[in-house]
């Protein structure tokens, strides 16, 4: 038996593997079903959406017609909304990742008075619904005259209690104390240690935190709804919502816009999949 072979007694039985595969197939269908339905629906007109099956294409392909209607209804602003969402999500993701890793590293590696209380406050933030904070955030942003600006989305979304929690877990498991102590003995400052050593060790974990913040910012709806009035500053989620409020909207065009709005997220996850998976594993075992 090779060293990497699993002992026969530990191997799952054939029925167990069959049940596992069946469950995974069901979960896969559950996850991909809405995306498939969105692809099919984006090729249909309003009448076809009401008269044909939602799980198969109709005889007429209205994809190009829906795209023209999408551009017409949005007055050419649809791709501007996509770029806005990319801007908000990318900047908030980068800032939020740095803040989360810095805070998590500080909580994991530094002893200071009140550290336990700070961790309790951060964990409490995980239990609080985001929608509950929307109105207080609006009042704060309005008081400092940041409403209807890009910062009204970027700044709140850059603060992530879940990101800080992940940063602490990853820093505690992936940054050895011996390396930090050696750098201090060599005369390195805490800032230099963080930027030259800690960030490199936590690079895979940072990708995971970035993806969580990026997706959360991209999907954020209530905050832009409260703080953004200008059509040129809307993210794609708010822009598509404004389309749905029109009288007799073109649902095929609306669904096509939703499909195009999902593509950047799919590309991002596929492109960063290797780093994301290694980042999830990084916090699983304490080194």
Language model feature labels by segment:
Residues 1-13:
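Short, Lys/Arg-rich, polar N-terminal cytosolic tail immediately upstream
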Residues 16-287:
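A structural signal for multi-pass alpha-helical bundles of membrane permease subunits
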């Amino acid at each position: 038996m090779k060293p990497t072979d699993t002992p026969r007694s530990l191997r799952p039985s054939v029925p167990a593997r069959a049940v596992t595969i069946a469950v995974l197939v069901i979960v896969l269908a559950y996850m991909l079903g809405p995306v498939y339905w969105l692809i099919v629906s984006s090729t249909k007109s309003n009448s076809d959406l009401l008269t044909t099956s939602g799980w198969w294409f109709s005889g007429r392909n209205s994809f190009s017609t829906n795209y023209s209607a999408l551009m017409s209804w949005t007055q050419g602003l649809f791709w501007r909304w996509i770029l806005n969402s990319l801007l908000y999500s990318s900047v908030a993701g980068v800032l939020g990742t740095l803040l989360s890793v810095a805070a998590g590293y500080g909580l994991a590696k530094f002893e200071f008075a009140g550290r336990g209380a700070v961790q309790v406050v951060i964990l409490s933030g995980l239990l609080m619904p985001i929608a509950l904070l929307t109105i207080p955030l609006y009042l704060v942003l309005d008081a400092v005259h940041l409403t209807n600006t890009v910062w009204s989305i970027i700044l709140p979304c850059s603060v992530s209690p879940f990101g800080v929690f992940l940063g602490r877990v990853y820093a505690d498991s992936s940054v050895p104390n011996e390396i930090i102590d050696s750098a201090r003995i060599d005369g390195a400052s805490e800032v230099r240690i963080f930027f030259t050593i800690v960030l490199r060790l936590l690079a895979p974990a940072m990708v995971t935190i970035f993806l969580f913040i990026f997706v959360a910012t991209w999907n954020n709806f209530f905050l832009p709804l409260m703080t953004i009035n200008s059509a040129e500053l809307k993210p794609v989620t708010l822009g598509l919502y404004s389309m749905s409020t029109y009288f007799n909207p073109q649902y095929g065009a609306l669904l096509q816009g939703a499909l195009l709005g999902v593509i950047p997220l799919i590309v991002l996850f596929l492109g960063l999949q290797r780093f994301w998976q290694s980042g999830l594993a990084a916090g699983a075992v304490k080194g």
